Amino acid sequence: MLAVFAISGCYSLEPRSAGSVMRLVEESEKITATGYAVIAIQNSDDAAQRRLLAIRASKLDAYRALAEQVFGQRIDSQTTIGELVVNNDAFRSRVEGVIYGAELESIEPLNGDTYAVTLSLRKQVVKDLRLLYLRSLLRDAA
């Protein structure tokens, strides 16, 4: 009985504070994000241009993924219920922010028909971006 109490006494059920979440990001030197795009669905008749478009699309997808990590996502949802039955359930996700200082880590072809682009941001750039974002929120609220 005493052993169970000692073990359970070491674990906190309290949610993590914002400061502890920020420390998780600060412990690594950089954050990374990878974007993907399929070559075959790119809008061009020329194979070389489809590859270039896939690289461009996967780079934009990687930027979106970086923005999600830096600024988070806004989720809007709506559920319609009639006669205690769900008639419609819809949600939308939106990411908004400015990313600068991203470094290209790699451009890799995958399985012959997909490109993966990996970008990274140094932790100091992440701090700067978040600070600028918070300042813009305060300015807009005033």
Predicted features by range, described:
Residues C10-A142:
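Domain-level marker for long, solvent-exposed, non-transmembrane regions
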Residues M1-C10:
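Sec-dependent bacterial lipoprotein signal peptides
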